[in-house]
């Protein structure tokens, strides 16, 4: 019975952690939390886009 609980717990941990990595940055707070800044249209210079800040035109750049 303990093995069933352990396997269920392992399955839940794997599924819950995988869902967080597939989603991009989608808000101002999560952008700032990932050490990014929100800018209109494009990321300048050597910065790259890591997500969007609520609107598709506002990019989260780091």
UniProtKB/Swiss-Prot annotation:
This is Beta-defensin 10. Gene3D superfamilies: Antimicrobial Peptide, Beta-defensin 2, Chain A. It comes from Bos taurus (Bovine). It is found in: Secreted. InterPro entries: Beta/alpha-defensin_C (IPR006080), Defensin_beta-like (IPR001855). Disulfide bonds join 31-60, 38-53, 43-61. GO terms for molecular function: CCR6 chemokine receptor binding; chemoattractant activity. The modification Pyrrolidone carboxylic acid is found at residue 23. GO terms for biological process: cell chemotaxis; defense response to bacterium.
